[in-house]
């Protein structure tokens, strides 16, 4: 896929965020509707997306292939956690800001942007592997995400029973054992889950509407974070996978592309829900998403 094809995909993402921004400025969306939309996404729509991604159990890779992809996932998240332990100390900032740095380094926008870009680059087969790589994201993001963003005092073990966590565990079992869901159920889950991307992008755009954009562009910390998130981490992952030979070339390339995605949109929803730094998180998402219009096509052209 050419640089300009991937570039076009990224412009679509930004257009939807701009629509959310405009809707907030015109009064169609407010802080209250943002909170309600956040709960709707985390409680119903995102779980449907997670379950729908493995609804066609007979077309997923074999159990052995899934376990092989999970090995790549261990390297993927291991690198993310390693960087999250070091980089925030260099960037500095308040405790909740450092929570944003850590979350941004560990969790990229693997599903909302990663799925369509992976399929566009590597074909429909890539979706199956991307789904498996995203499964640990769902478990880690919705369990550790509140802890990272809001601090240990805000963490409750009941969060492990959130709809997204439960859906992720079920999805992993469905994938490993190739359980076939009824076709109608799969269609319903996929249809409802398909609302995730536009609604999430509208939500982020609405959150950005009340923020001073100058801070995102003038903060050296955010620029350093964006460089690490979008360029350094993907290159480090590519070098490690190539050196160790973990995973097939296709799976390795998919993992690198997913690592090159901007900060996960889920961060805004989780920061709002659990009392994290919503402003800093939204700025991280905005700047990394904006910069990824250039960095993702560049990395894709090099693979």
Where in the sequence are the language-model features?
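Alpha-helical transmembrane segments of multi-pass small-molecule/ion transporters
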Residues: 1-303
């Amino acid at each position: 896929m050419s640089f300009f094809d991937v570039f076009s995909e990224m412009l679509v993402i930004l257009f939807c965020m701009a629509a959310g921004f405009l809707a907030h400025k015109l009064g169609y969306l407010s802080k209250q509707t943002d909170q309600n939309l956040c709960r709707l996404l985390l409680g119903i729509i995102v779980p449907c997306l997670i379950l729908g991604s493995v609804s066609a159990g007979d077309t997923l890779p074999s159990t052995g292939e899934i376990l092989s992809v999970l090995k790549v996932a261990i390297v993927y998240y291991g690198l993310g956690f390693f960087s999250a332990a070091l980089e925030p100390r260099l960037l500095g900032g308040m405790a909740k800001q450092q929570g944003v740095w850590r979350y941004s380094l560990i969790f990229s926008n693997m599903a909302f942007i990663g799925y369509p870009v992976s399929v566009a680059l590597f074909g429909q087969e890539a979706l199956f592997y991307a789904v498996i790589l995203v499964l640990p994201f769902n478990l880690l993001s919705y369990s550790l995400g509140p802890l990272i963003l809001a601090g240990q005092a805000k963490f409750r073990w009941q969060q492990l029973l959130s709809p997204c966590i439960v859906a992720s565990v079920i999805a992993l079992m469905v994938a490993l054992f190739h359980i076939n869901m009824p076709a109608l159920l799969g269609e319903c889950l996929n249809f409802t889950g398909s609302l995730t991307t536009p609604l999430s992008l509208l939500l982020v755009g609405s959150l950005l509407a009340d923020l001073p954009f100058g801070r995102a562009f003038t903060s050296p910390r955010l620029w350093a974070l964006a460089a690490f998130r979008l360029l350094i981490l993907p290159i480090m992952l590519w070098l490690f996978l190539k050196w160790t030979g973990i995973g097939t070339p296709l799976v390795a390339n998919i993992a690198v592309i997913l690592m090159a995605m901007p900060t996960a949109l889920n961060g805004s929803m989780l920061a709002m829900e659990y009392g994290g730094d919503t402003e800093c998180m939204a700025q991280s998402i905005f700047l990394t998403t904006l910069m990824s219009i250039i960095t993702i096509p560049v990395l894709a052209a090099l693979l």
